[in-house]
Amino acid sequence: MNEKYPIGEFQFDGEITNIIINEWINEIEDLPRLLKNTVIDLNNEQLDTSYRSGGWTVRQVIHHLADSHMNAYIRLKLAITEENPVIKPYDEKEWAELYDYNLPIEISLSLIEALHKRWCSLLRDLSPTDMERTFKHPESGSISIGKNIGIYAWHGKHHLAHITSLCKRKDW
């Protein structure tokens, strides 16, 4: 198994249908519960274990999910309210070294739970036309709301798999 990409990289070349979008939204909606159930019984030593050599700790992954998904939520709102806005990328590796990544995971678990409720509520209210709206990433180009939903459904599962595969390897 590839420890960096345990579920593979995001790939989707087909037509983004309402059925697929609803599946992706369900996956985004389920992440807070799945994440909490996976990490709730881990101790500090386990939380401060890297999921792979040179990779983030479990604690950093959890805080990263909060930061990344907050950015996704803001990008969604920008794409809904502006014409193909240029979004600001951030240096996730540098963010993972900031002090707040040492805080208890419960803070980010609560944030992720609340954020995903708002995010999924907004996503479920979008029309098929809204799904075609875009934002522009300076490196990746224009990305539709529909595709970005898929990217973030994958993103949550990707990082959850980092944690679950570590727990399995360590027999936690």
Swiss-Prot record:
Q: Tell me, how does this one assemble?
A: Homodimer.
Write out the residues that bind Zn(2+): H64, H155, H159
Which cofactors? Zn(2+)
- Co-factor note (free text): Binds 1 zinc ion per subunit.
Per the entry, what this protein does is: Possible metal-dependent hydrolase.
**Protein localization:** Cytoplasm
Checking Pfam families in the record gives: DinB_2
> Where is this protein primarily located?
cytoplasm
Query: Gene3D superfamilies given for it?
Result: dinb family like domain (1.20.120.450)
Q: List the disulfide bonds.
A: none
Q: According to the UniProt entry, what is the EC number of this protein?
A: 3.-.-.-
What is the recorded name of this protein? Putative metal-dependent hydrolase OB0782
Gene Ontology cellular component list = cytoplasm
